C-alpha cells in the first residue's frame, strides 16, 4: 500500500504540479543518457552545468552568481543547465515554482542521483565549445573565480 501511495504521489509531483524550470522550459526528469546528449548537442556553444539540491544553502548563494553570469552571457552565447540531485523531486519543484531560474533546470532521475551520490553540491562543470571539460568547480566559489572560468569558455 505504501508503494502505491508513493507512486501516486510521485506521479502527481512529476506531472500535475506547475512545472516552471526557468528560461520558460518545463521541468523534466533527466537520465544519465539524456544528460550526456544535452552536453554533446552544444552546437558550438559552451555549457555551464550545475548540480544542486533544494536543501543546500550554499546552492542558493551560488545561484545568485549564476544569475549574474546569465545576465552577462545570453543563451545565444552560453548554455546553462541546473540539475537537481534531490532524491524527492517535490522540494526542488516547489523551490523552482517559487523562484524560477533564468536558465533551464532538470530533476535527476534515480540512476543519475545514485551515480552522483557522493558529489558535493553545488558542483559546476564548465564545458568548452568542443564539449571537453574546462573546469569543475566545487562549492559556492567566488563570483570573480566563476566569472574568470566562464569568460574563458565563452572566449575560446
Residue ranges and their predicted role:
Residues 21-24:
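Boundary at the C-terminal end of the N-terminal hydrophobic targeting segment
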Residues 26-47:
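A short beta-strand-turn-helix
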Residues 45-47, 51-55, 120:
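Short pre-active-site segment immediately N-terminal to redox-active cysteine/selenocysteine motifs
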Residues 48-49, 80, 124:
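Hydrophobic beta-strand anchors of alpha/beta hydrolase catalytic cores
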Residues 51-68:
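Conserved redox-active cysteine motifs that mediate thiol-disulfide chemistry
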Residues 61-64, 71-108:
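Conserved segment of the thioredoxin-like fold in thiol-based oxidoreductases
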Residues 97-101, 107-151:
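Thiol/disulfide oxidoreductase modules built on the thioredoxin-like
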Amino acid at each position: 500500500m505504501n508503494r502505491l501511495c508513493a507512486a501516486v504521489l510521485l506521479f502527481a509531483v512529476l506531472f500535475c504540479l506547475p512545472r516552471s524550470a526557468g528560461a520558460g522550459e518545463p521541468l523534466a526528469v533527466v537520465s544519465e543518457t539524456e544528460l550526456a546528449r544535452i552536453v554533446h548537442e552544444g552546437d558550438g556553444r559552451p555549457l555551464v552545468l550545475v548540480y544542486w539540491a533544494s536543501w543546500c544553502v550554499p546552492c542558493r548563494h551560488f545561484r545568485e552568481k549564476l544569475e549574474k553570469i546569465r545576465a552577462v552571457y545570453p543563451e545565444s552565447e552560453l548554455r546553462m543547465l541546473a540539475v537537481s540531485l534531490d532524491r524527492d523531486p517535490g522540494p526542488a519543484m516547489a523551490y523552482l515554482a517559487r523562484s524560477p531560474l533564468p536558465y533551464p533546470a532538470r530533476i535527476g532521475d534515480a540512476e543519475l542521483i545514485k551515480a552522483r551520490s557522493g558529489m558535493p553540491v553545488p558542483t559546476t562543470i564548465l564545458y568548452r565549445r568542443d564539449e571537453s571539460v574546462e573546469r569543475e568547480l566545487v562549492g559556492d566559489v567566488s563570483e570573480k573565480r566563476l566569472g574568470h572560468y566562464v569568460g574563458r569558455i565563452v572566449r575560446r
